[in-house]
Amino acid sequence: MDRVVLMLSVLSLGVSSQPITDGQRLFSIAVSRVQHLHLLAQRLFSDFESSLQTEEQRQLNKIFLQDFCNSDYIISPIDKHETQRSSVLKLLSISYRLVESWEFPSRSLAGGSAPRNQISPKLSELKTGIHLLIRANEDGAELFPDSSALQLAPYGDYYQSPGTDESLRRTYELLACFKKDMHKVETYLTVAKCRLSPEANCTL
C-alpha cells in the first residue's frame, strides 16, 4: 500500500502533497498527462508539416491514408458509439496497450528540443498511472490474455538508414501515428473517467 501511495504521489507532480486515494483524482491526473502528450504530438506533427513543401505534404498525406499504424493491430472501438458502450476496464486495457506500444518507437522522437525529450518519460509515467487504475478496477489476473501477440515491430525498418524521401515518409508516419494514438488514449481515458460520475453526460 505504501508503494502505491508513493507512486501516486510521484504521478501528481505537485498537484497535491497528500496521498491520492480517490479514483476520480487519479483519473484526472492520467487525463491531464495524455492531454499534454496529445498537444505535444499535434505540435510536433504541425511543425514537421510546416517544414515540408506543399507537394511533399500532399504526397505524404496520400501515402499515410493508405498505410497503417503499428497500433492498428491493437483491437479497439471502431467508433464513438462502441467507445461509449465499452467498460471502464476495457478502455483502460486498450489505453495501456496503446501507450505501451510507443515505449520503444518514442525514442526516435527524442532529440533536438526539450519537449521531444519529455515524450518517453511522460509515456512511462502515464503507463504507470493507467496500470494503477487497472489494478483499482480489477485484479488484473486475466487482463492481457493475448499480450504475447502484442509484441509489435518498431515500425518495420524505420531504424535503418533510408534515403531522404524515405526518411521524410517514415518521420511523417511516426508523428502522424503518435498523434492519432494519443488522441485515442485521451478519448478512452476521458470516457472512463466520466463513468465515475453517474450524473455526468459522457456523450462524445
UniProtKB/Swiss-Prot annotation:
Residues with PTM Pyrrolidone carboxylic acid: Q18
Highest taxon of the lineage: Eukaryota
Binding site for Zn(2+): H36, E186
UniProt KW Zinc keyword: yes
Signal peptide boundaries: 1-17
InterPro entries: 4_helix_cytokine-like_core, Somatotropin, Somatotropin/Prolactin, Somatotropin_CS
Pfam families: Hormone_1
Gene Ontology CC: one annotated term: extracellular space
Disulfide bonds: C69-C177, C194-C202
GO biological process assignments: animal organ development; growth hormone receptor signaling pathway; positive regulation of growth; positive regulation of receptor signaling pathway via JAK-STAT; response to nutrient levels
Any one GO molecular-function label of the UniProt entry: metal ion binding
Main location: secreted
Sorted UniProt keywords: Disulfide bond, Hormone, Metal-binding, Pyrrolidone carboxylic acid, Secreted, Signal, Zinc
Location relative to the cell: Secreted
Function: Growth hormone plays an important role in growth control and is involved in the regulation of several anabolic processes. Implicated as an osmoregulatory substance important for seawater adaptation.
Family: Belongs to the somatotropin/prolactin family.
Protein name from the UniProt record: Somatotropin
Organism expressing this protein natively: Acanthopagrus latus (Yellowfin seabream)
